[in-house]
């Protein structure tokens, strides 16, 4: 991909303009979700061509509007310096790159946001507000465009590439692993453990005509020029994958990206992995690489039931093969087993790298505990939109 496209001129806001926008922060906090929900409705009606870049399930549940509202609020609070939210911004950049977001889509979002503010705030969204907001939005949009251009240059390929399904394996009663290889024979490079790939699914449903974008973690390193994803049946697309996808089917795949990557240069000798349910998928290559690096690995693995627990045999064998270097701690909710913070009391932040992924409530509980314990470099990500609740 070429150099970043310059669609917006970055013009620093004046102190007066910053104060004006920040004075509206309480309004954005209170009405932000209404604004963003209105924005998406307007945008999808006015610019239907962008629908295929958005997960419509996240629209229906309100997760995507909530995340965008949170993003706008945080941007307004940090107009002087984005450094405190740089991690959050980086997750957005990588998400956009994984989905193949293009610079030309930013003016569409900007115009739709302006219209939504006018509809929701009425006279409060006057000419002065619109002028200052457009300036601030343009600065943010071009910053993201520049950052995304830098990421695109590092990816293994541009755009989406057709992959063929080579194998389907049932890992649990509601989890299927999908093995895929490039149709054109492209040689896949080893992944960085923790990366995910984005898909564009046509699920052949007469009631759902839009292409459905989804991201799934790569659940093992590249073998035989194949990626593997492992998908739990919890939604429209995942139901299609588990029940209707067939060997030989073709699906477009974007190059891997990721925020929760294995830290291969860490000098710490121990790794603790906390995984809830299907959050185990990116942890598998992370665990394997940590063991190859000679680290002691502890897995705290929570599932609803034995029937819903994927990779049970794999982890059991891994424990046997590694002579005490890998310790598996299983927690099954149906058996009244639950990971407790007391199970993690021994974790010394100076000795352990810690990885965390699972349902939002699970992540919130253990993130709060681990950060309070002094784990300053906790490695985690979110399935779905970057969640402001965690």
Swiss-Prot record:
Entries under SUPFAM superfamilies matching the protein: Ferredoxin reductase-like, C-terminal NADP-linked domain, Globin-like, Riboflavin synthase domain-like
Modified residues (N-acetylserine): 2
Record domain Globin: where: 12-149
Feature type site, description Involved in heme-bound ligand stabilization and O-O bond activation: 40
Binding positions (NADP(+)): 277-282
Cofactors (names): FAD; heme b
Reductase as annotated region, ranges: 157-390
Keyword annotations: Acetylation, Cytoplasm, Detoxification, FAD, Flavoprotein, Heme, Iron, Metal-binding, NAD, NADP, Oxidoreductase
Main location: cytoplasm
Function summary: Is involved in NO detoxification in an aerobic process, termed nitric oxide dioxygenase (NOD) reaction that utilizes O(2) and NAD(P)H to convert NO to nitrate, which protects the fungus from various noxious nitrogen compounds. Therefore, plays a central role in the inducible response to nitrosative stress. In the presence of oxygen and NADH, it has NADH oxidase activity, which leads to the generation of superoxide and H(2)O(2). Under anaerobic conditions, it also exhibits nitric oxide reductase and FAD reductase activities. However, all these reactions are much lower than NOD activity.
Protein name stated in the entry: Flavohemoprotein
